[in-house]
Amino acid sequence: MHVRATPAMHRLIGTVLILACAFASAPAEAGFRSPESLIRNVYAYYGNGSPEVSDGLPRDPDTARQFFDPSLRTAWASAKSEPYDFLVQSPTWRVGPVSISILRKQYDKTYVSVAFDNMGRSVRLDYILVKGPDGWLTTDVESPYDSLRMFLDQFKN
């Protein structure tokens, strides 16, 4: 039995191939659809384990473009000698469940509180997120003692 391809099948196959090529060659998109999605994706890089199992949020330019606004991207991608990972407040981690709550929405800016246990120690950070044309990005992260911007500025190479 011989199956004959119709013009509609040719168009469908052509469309699928074009879409596959477009998605395969597209760089990582910047931003996320919601503040919660951005936070969940940050901490997904820390996994259920420790630095031996997970390297945390990568320091490459593509990841920086996806998670940070332009003013913070270069600092994130270029810092290499920090004494600890600011996003978990420790050089080692075993991150427990992450609690996310919106503190305040202000035009295109949203303040998000993030809390979790890291190896039995309670950690609370406040993310300042901005909404741009590509979605939500991090403009800063504040701990009770420091901010990500100031922290990265201290250790820039």
Would you name each region that the model predicts?
Residues L125-V130:
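Hydrophobic/aromatic beta-strand elements that line small-molecule binding cavities or substrate pockets
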Residues S50-D60:
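Surface-exposed patches in mature extracellular/periplasmic domains of secreted proteins
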